[in-house]
Amino acid sequence: MTVTVEAPVKSVEAVNLQEVQEEAKGKGKQAKKGKSRSKSKPQIQEPVSTETAVPETAVPETAVPEVAVPETSSHEEAPTQQQSRSKRKKADQKQIALKIICSSDVLGQTLAIACRAIAGRPSHPVLANVLVQADVESQSVKLTGFDLSLGIEATFSAQVEAGGKICLPAKLLNDIVSKLPSGEVTLWCSSKESEGDETLGEKLSCGLEYASGQVSFSGISPEEFPSLPKVDGRAVYLPSETLLEGLRGTLFATSTDETKQVLTGVHVTLERDEVEFASTDGHRLAVVKATTSSAVEDEYTESSGSHEEPTEVTIPGKALYLVEHLLKSLPTSSRRIEESEGEEEHQSSVVEVRFEPGQLIFRMDNYQINTRTLEGQYPNIHQLIPKQFLREVTVERRSFLSAMERIAILADSKNNVVKFSIDPTEQMITAFVEAANVGSGKEAIPVDISGESLDIAFNIKYVIDALKSLSSSDAILHINRNNTPAIFTPIGGETQKLVLLMPIQIRD
């Protein structure tokens, strides 16, 4: 019996496995599982002997692998799954969504400008954020603020180690950066995977590292941040000096009354060889005209040779105050303009202004400002301006302005009235202010008077604003009567300027 068992065991090793599997297909469920788990099963089933001991031995041997298989499988697979999950979690936590290194001063200046488009009470939570976009290829960072009416894109150079985009809380970030010491800072954002969510980037942990410390805060996905409107209409290129002078000469006269929406902006008229800026609040009017050949360069009229119809648009004062700020404090954009011979080129400092119905953009240096335009018919300002005057008072602008600022301290805070007494005999103008229960003030200023004597009153704040808007050394006050508009104009200068003031009626 012993010999009979050993001989088949040795022969089983030479048996083809495929033949053994084919013979085992017709057997029971336990025999089928045993074949796939253990090599001993073919050794037991191979002998085709009449001995009944062989199948009796196969049953317990088949049961052994059934118990062993699940124990071995659970023991080997469990650590593998835990390690995989752990590695994936660590990888997600270390996933860098954005990382930049830059100067704290540059970041602070650029961020402060972008935040000027952030509304105090945004209509949507995402609008309380500034969109940060970092580009590895250009090594630049773009900050965007948008309140659905005014949008600002501000770009600066930085060392970008990881590109991407994220929305960060504008006020919080601006407050932090404004307090940082000068030096290098690192801004980074790390993506985290939400529980049970395979999409990275929905939860973002961010930090700002500087020489003496670090801060951490949260960002949100940029997907909901609205895109700034694209404006592809007519484009003109204004010399930066012309645009700045036009804004300086008109912005002060815009209305602050939101019920008169169209008067809260500056009305701009663009023609082939002229640009006009105008503003009024109903009590005063300011107009600036630039009529030199370099005032407007139009890409369409230059290419076609045709004369475009004048473009008229009313631009919100909020957007223009920002443009003025950038023009005064930052270098404006430069655009190459070819000479007529095509041989030489020179740099001309210009600002691109592009129009579409309801929208326009300003592009200068590293900044782009998007703004909606104001709807409504702007008043016909030219019919309000007198053509002739009976009296002219020529003043030294700075000394006259200083006198007005001194006596304005004692003017009545309710109406700010200053009374002018014009004396052509003495060639003197006397300014008088009075405030009940406070005091009074008087200044006598030597001037050059043409015409008869007259007493007239104005809002002294309007007089001061008018004198500040004129950049010349001397100015002329044009007057007809004490109940008709008076006008301040500069003497000299390349642009035409005027400020119209309505007199205040006084009782003797």
For the regions a language model picked out, list residue spans one by one:
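Structural preference for solvent-exposed beta-strand-turn elements
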Residues: T2-K33, K39-D508
